[in-house]
Amino acid sequence: MAAAAAAGPSPGSGPGDSPEGPEGEAPERRRKAHGMLKLYYGLSEGEAAGRPAGPDPLDPTDLNGAHFDPEVYLDKLRRECPLAQLMDSETDMVRQIRALDSDMQTLVYENYNKFISATDTIRKMKNDFRKMEDEMDRLATNMAVITDFSARISATLQDRHERITKLAGVHALLRKLQFLFELPSRLTKCVELGAYGQAVRYQGRAQAVLQQYQHLPSFRAIQDDCQVITARLAQQLRQRFREGGSGAPEQAECVELLLALGEPAEELCEEFLAHARGRLEKELRNLEAELGPSPPAPDVLEFTDHGGSGFVGGLCQVAAAYQELFAAQGPAGAEKLAAFARQLGSRYFALVERRLAQEQGGGDNSLLVRALDRFHRRLRAPGALLAAAGLADAATEIVERVARERLGHHLQGLRAAFLGCLTDVRQALAAPRVAGKEGPGLAELLANVASSILSHIKASLAAVHLFTAKEVSFSNKPYFRGEFCSQGVREGLIVGFVHSMCQTAQSFCDSPGEKGGATPPALLLLLSRLCLDYETATISYILTLTDEQFLVQDQFPVTPVSTLCAEARETARRLLTHYVKVQGLVISQMLRKSVETRDWLSTLEPRNVRAVMKRVVEDTTAIDVQVGLLYEEGVRKAQSSDSSKRTFSVYSSSRQQGRYAPSYTPSAPMDTNLLSNIQKLFSERIDVFSPVEFNKVSVLTGIIKISLKTLLECVRLRTFGRFGLQQVQVDCHFLQLYLWRFVADEELVHLLLDEVVASAALRCPDPVPMEPSVVEVICERG
């Protein structure tokens, strides 16, 4: 218990914890203190007593209860708890008392500071209100004094105020009379000094009074003098106006003064427009002089600035002054001004169009668009002043016309660039090859052409996109938001160029002897691949790029991408087919000459393959390499294992030599012809000019079919001796050894070469074939 005594109330304990509280402290106050402590620790009444919630509210041992009795509680603890538990309870109670004491001190200090602050604030407010009350009292006293003085002054000056008012009226009347009597002298002095505006204002101030009192002799004399002076003033103003030496504002001032003096408005209107016409025509002559051939013409931007500041600025001044001076003329006067502006505006527009026409050959649109922007902006002001003249609409039409011409110019530029690329390709293909230095291949030439054309297209799109830039004044016009984007750029420029490119490429497929006859086959192959690339990717790319840059906001019909792709694919197919025909005809020409220029009846026994056959194989190999640079391999049928070992008999491979050779004698030609015709009935029909696919195998197959078909037809027209037949047999075997690997189906080569040998046998009086082993030896040696 000593520890409990040591831990007694501290000096800072709150009143609720001290046993020295007020003597009359009520039980209700104690209950509130206990309730605050319970809320602070978050305990219910039962938990605070260490027993389950919901105790008997009349229990005297409940620490938090309203009927707590400390003596009963202590007796209970002494009876029920051992000494150790009592010591623990004491220690816990001391700890709780100290904690509660600290919390109570904190609460007291915090509330005390707030109370002190509130007290100071209230004291300050009382002092301020006390000063304010004193000031309000002094203000009320001063207002009472002022009111008293004001009443006394009003009472004193009431009679004098009436007299002063009368005297002021008399004084004003005297001043007016003095002004009237001095008016002639004032007008004369103003005219002598050139102060015409002041003189007109004087006359305007006195005219109504003089008109009203003109029946009085004195006023009549003043009016007569003023009329004489006014007439002289009007004459001088007219003279100054007619001289025209001053600028437009001064002339407008003269007209305004003349109108104020009562001069006829119709006559002044005509004279005003006539003088304005002279000044504006002078500006037009200056602009026309800048277009002359002798001095170097200024750039289009400078020309537009001159026209805008000179003619257009002058026209704006004339229109503004006319509408201000002659507003009373009504619709007739407005129409007269509109006709005046239309007549001069048409001449100005003609000069501007002449200058803009000189810019059509240039490739840069930036300067031209800036000039058109300034031209269009400067005509907004007269367009607003002269809505009936339609100057703004005419200016917009000029801008639209120039934009259309620029689109046509860029289309021609793209066509010229494409033709220039083709010329470069021709020169590269025709250039002699330097020993040890490889020239550009077809793939490189194709890449150069494609990139060059694409860069020109992008440059053209960027150039015409300047017409739709947001900072350009005319870009919000309906034409540039709709038709220019869809019909002008997309259809006219891009789609038009694709059509033109396809037409130009197809023109190389003309019949021999015309343009197509001089076209290098490699150029046909390159153009075919270029059109195929356009069909697969480029057309979609450039149209997507165009649609993204030029947001179309109208419903004009446009060409679908699929239509352009189909046209490009058809062009590529025609070019590739023509390439096959040209290359096939080149080889066919060699074979035809080799057959027609040889005496097959007097031919010696064959010892070698003819050189023309070697040339055919070499050219075919070169074509294979050339086509392989641009096209994929393609698909071949499964090849037989003996393709390079097969030899030709006198007849086709379907007929055994031992079976038919003994029966072939000069006495039995009908039997041999019959057998050949029967064999043809069961052979597969060969379509020489079948459609060509976009791969190397299909191209080589078409060329070889044309070549071998030509050889077959030439052989059918010749007569062969025994050794001539054997030479054909050797040549065909040599061709078979090398040509089968180029075609899609090797049976095609076998069939055609069988036909060649069989036809030669039919045209031979003594068809004795060479042994296959000998043929193989000769071909291997060759």
UniProtKB/Swiss-Prot annotation:
GO terms for biological process: autophagy; brain morphogenesis; endocytic recycling; Golgi organization; Golgi vesicle transport; lysosomal transport; protein targeting; protein transport. InterPro entries: Cullin_repeat-like_dom_sf (IPR016159), Vps51 (IPR014812). Keywords: Acetylation, Coiled coil, Disease variant, Endosome, Golgi apparatus, Intellectual disability, Lipid transport, Phosphoprotein, Protein transport, Transport. Pfam families: VPS51_Exo84_N. The modification Phosphoserine is found at S18, S44, S649. GO terms for cellular component: cytosol; EARP complex; GARP complex; Golgi apparatus; intracellular membrane-bounded organelle; membrane; nucleolus; recycling endosome. The modification N-acetylalanine is found at A2. SUPFAM superfamilies: Cullin repeat-like. Residues 1-19 have a biased composition (Low complexity). Residues 1-37 are annotated as: Disordered. It comes from the Eukaryota. It is found in: Golgi apparatus, trans-Golgi network; Recycling endosome. Changing R490C: In PCH13; impaired association with VPS50 and VPS53 subunits; reduced levels of assembled GARP and EARP complexes. Transmembrane segments: none annotated. Residues 116-147, 270-292 form a coiled coil. Component of the Golgi-associated retrograde protein (GARP) complex, also called VFT (VPS fifty-three) complex, composed of VPS51, VPS52, VPS53 and VPS54. Component of the endosome-associated retrograde protein (EARP) complex, composed of VPS51, VPS52, VPS53 and VPS50/Syndetin. EIPR1 interacts with both EARP and GARP complexes and mediates the recruitment of the GARP complex to the trans-Golgi network. Interacts with STX6 (via N-terminus). Interacts with VPS50 and VPS54 in an EIPR1-independent manner. It is linked to Pontocerebellar hypoplasia 13: A form of pontocerebellar hypoplasia, a disorder characterized by structural defects of the pons and cerebellum, evident upon brain imaging. PCH13 is an autosomal recessive form characterized by delayed psychomotor development, absent speech, severe intellectual disability and postnatal microcephaly, with brain malformations consisting of cerebellar atrophy and hypoplastic corpus callosum. Additional features, including seizures and visual impairment, are variable. Acts as a component of the GARP complex that is involved in retrograde transport from early and late endosomes to the trans-Golgi network (TGN). The GARP complex is required for the maintenance of protein retrieval from endosomes to the TGN, acid hydrolase sorting, lysosome function, endosomal cholesterol traffic and autophagy. VPS51 participates in retrograde transport of acid hydrolase receptors, likely by promoting tethering and SNARE-dependent fusion of endosome-derived carriers to the TGN. Acts as a component of the EARP complex that is involved in endocytic recycling. Belongs to the VPS51 family. This is Vacuolar protein sorting-associated protein 51 homolog. It comes from Homo sapiens.
